[in-house]
From Swiss-Prot:
Residues 1-31 form a transit peptide. Pfam families: EFG_C, GTP_EFTU, GTP_EFTU_D2, LepA_C. Residues 48-229 form the tr-type G domain. One of its GO terms (cellular component) is mitochondrial matrix. The gene is Guf1. It comes from the Eukaryota. Keywords: GTP-binding, Hydrolase, Membrane, Mitochondrion, Mitochondrion inner membrane, Nucleotide-binding, Protein biosynthesis, Transit peptide. This is Translation factor Guf1, mitochondrial. It comes from Mus musculus. GTP binds at residues 57-64, 122-126, 176-179. It is a peripheral membrane protein.
Length: 651
């Protein structure tokens, strides 16, 4: 069965499997330094000598390390100890040791007396960036599925395999980290056979860190991955699968050529915007930009054509020659934001700088959605949509590191939906089903027939001894169990349907702490389901605070309300009168905390004497406090808002 499935070929890559002679492998630089300066001639590579492949894996299984070794082995970069995460160019990627943005590199490799062009696309491993992975796979005909010999198959390994499987790509399983003391490649090989139906003898066992057996990976790429099925004599047809923004040269589009040839000076048109551009530069990524005279069908490279805005280089767009229109390639589904958070400048005088920083960063990250927003307490800001929590943290970190912009980031919320009940409301909103990304705009129960909340299908892979604890955690998060599979005698795969708002803040942390860090988690969008949602208001002495309005499930209303009231009590400064902090659903108060008043000792001047004198002074004081409480406006300091609204770890 696997012979039919695992080697299934991409629709545009159904070329015959290339049988390479099993002669000794010889890695060499195809172009000398002088030739590279002179722009290499890419016509040297016929289509049958090109392989486009991607490396996919769970976070931390050694994708970027394997990419470094492949770059060294093909002479693309010099062999030094400094080669760590060569393709991870962002500071945030190097600090966190993760890949955020997919990167491309063209490798020149001699094997069996022939010279091959191998285009490698390194992809992120974290669930939030699976959109980046699916985009990268569209430019490939095969993948290296890397699995850690110690940890075995993890949740993201499964998710990434099915992305490649659905794209009908050849899959080469690679078991990495065989140098580790606890490595058990035989066990992992059996897991791969059981879960993915790939014979264990097809697995390549390597150590990317030490470079052990890595050359056999390159041999497998040539032998097992088919060349792209393209036509160079046809008019140009190129897919834009990624883009970055350079403030001096404009948009740099990463393209995969399906048909034809592109060279400097060509006039090209975008199928999406119908705008025409003149090509200023084309080239390959080696892994840095290396200009070439031309790019030919089957090759992957970059193109600069004077586009001023990344929205002009739409991901999934087709580029073609002016006066030679072609049938556009099927694009990608645009990434759907799963998490929304308010972003405000710490000081309103920084608004314009932050606006400019967000605009520049969203040029490079088209999956972030931006809506203008304002708050009485925090001033003008934005409501940004992200693919997940890590995506949000990385975006915030990049704002600070690359643009020196410090921001207030509010607790993330998820996009709810409401089905409106009356024709009048439907006419007002212009649709029956409205999406709510700001809790303050949540419609009343009387206006809707039902509320809907987003749900995701989550996969948890855990050692069997933690199964009970993890199942209890999932049930506490309102999850419904769908499936349970034993991968081997020590590990189990659980599938649950989760409400997205239950996992968005701290589920991952709780899962890791319950399983001593051994469990892994991945999720995919599963649409919407009806839910009993309520809008919870926070009142201070009876006055509603708009910024603290939240949407919660009815079951969780008390817990969340109590938590917000407690945090607000810690943050609010004491006044001369008592402050009642209440959480209310509709007219019903469900939680309350009290900030005690400062008390002046009005009896200090009384030395003994009649008790009625003391009672009179105390009565006058309490009347004054009542009056003050009625007319007193509670000023909530900005710091208090920040403490309450900011993401609360492990709360």
């Amino acid at each position: 069965m696997w012979a039919l499935v695992g080697r299934a070929l991409a629709p545009w890559a159904a070329g015959a499997r290339h049988a390479a002679a099993s002669e000794p492998r010889a890695a060499c630089r195809l172009f000398s330094a002088a030739e590279l300066k002179e722009k290499p001639d890419m016509s040297r590579f016929p289509v049958e000598d090109i392989r486009n492949f991607s490396i996919i894996a769970h976070v931390d299984h050694g994708k970027s390390t394997l990419a470094d070794r492949l770059l060294e082995l093909t002479g693309t970069i010099d062999k030094t100890k400094k080669n760590k995460q060569v393709l991870d160019k962002l500071q945030v990627e190097r600090e966190r040791g993760i890949t955020v943005k997919a990167q491309t590199a063209s490798l020149f490799y001699s094997f069996g007396g022939k010279q091959y062009l191998l285009n490698l696309i390194d992809t992120p491993g974290h669930v939030d960036f699976s959109y980046e992975v699916s985009r990268s796979l569209s430019a490939c005909q095969g993948v290296l599925l890397v699995v850690d010999a110690n940890e075995g198959i993890q949740a993201q390994t499964v998710a990434n395999f099915f992305l490649a499987f659905e794209a009908q790509l050849s899959v080469i399983p690679v078991i990495n980290k065989i140098d580790l003391k606890n490595a058990d490649p035989e066990r992992v090989g059996k897991q791969i056979e059981k879960v993915f139906d790939i014979p264990s003898e097809e697995c390549i066992k390597i150590s990317a860190k030490l470079g052990t057996n890595v050359d056999s990976v390159l041999q497998a790429v040539i032998e097992r991955i088919p060349p792209p099925k393209v036509h160079r004599e046809n008019p140009l047809k190129a897919l834009v699968f990624d883009s970055t923004f350079d403030q001096y040269r404009g948009v740099i589009a990463n393209i995969a050529l399906f048909d034809g040839v592109v060279s400097k000076g060509d006039k090209i048109v975008s199928a999406h915007t119908k705008k025409a551009y003149e090509v200023n530069e084309v080239g390959i990524l080696n892994p840095n930009e290396q200009p070439t005279h031309k790019l030919y069908a089957g090759q992957v490279g970059f193109l600069i054509a004077g586009m001023k805005d990344v929205t002009e280089a739409q991901i999934g767009d087709t580029l073609y020659l002016h006066n030679h229109p072609v049938e556009p390639l099927p694009g990608f589904k645009s990434a759907k934001p799963m998490v929304f958070a308010g972003v405000y400048p710490i000081d309103q005088s920084e608004y314009n700088n932050l606006k400019s920083a967000i605009e520049k960063l969203t040029l490079n990250d088209s999956s972030v959605t931006v809506h203008r927003d304002s708050s009485l307490a925090l001033g003008a800001g934005w409501r940004l949509g992200f693919l997940g929590l890590l995506h949000m943290e990385v975006f915030n970190q990049r704002l600070e590191q690359e643009y020196n912009a410090s921001v207030i980031l509010t607790t993330p919320t998820v996009p709810y939906k409401a089905v409106l009940s009356s024709a009048k409301l439907i006419k007002e909103y212009k649709e029956k089903e409205i999406t709510i990304i700001n809790p303050a705009q949540f419609p009343e129960k009387s206006q809707v027939t039902e509320y809907l909340e987003p749900v995701v299908l989550g996969t948890v892979i855990t050692p069997t001894e933690y199964t009970g604890k993890i199942m209890a955690l999932c049930q506490a998060r309102r999850a419904i169990q769908k499936n349970m599979t034993f991968i081997d005698e020590n590990r189990v795969m659980l599938k649950y349907l989760f409400p997205l708002n239950e996992i968005v803040v701290d589920f991952y942390d709780s899962l890791k702490s319950l399983s001593s860090g051994y469990a892994s988690f991945d999720y995919e969008d599963a649409g919407y389901q009806t839910a009993e949602l309520v809008k919870m208001d926070i009142l201070l002495n009876g006055n509603m605070v708009e910024e603290l309005v939240t949407v919660v499930h009815r079951e969780k209303a008390y817990t969340v309300g109590k938590s917000i009231c407690e945090r607000l009590k810690e943050s609010l400064p004491r006044q001369l009168y008592e402050i009642a902090i209440q959480a209310a659903v509709g007219s019903k108060v469900i939680a309350r905390e009290t900030v005690k008043a400062y008390r002046k000792n009005v009896l200090a001047k009384c030395y003994g004497g009649d008790i009625t004198r003391k009672m009179k002074l105390l009565k006058r004081q309490s009347e004054g406090k009542k009056k003050l409480r009625k007319i007193g406006n509670i000023e909530i300091p900005k710091d208090a808002f920040i403490k309450v609204l900011k993401t609360q770890p492990n709360k």
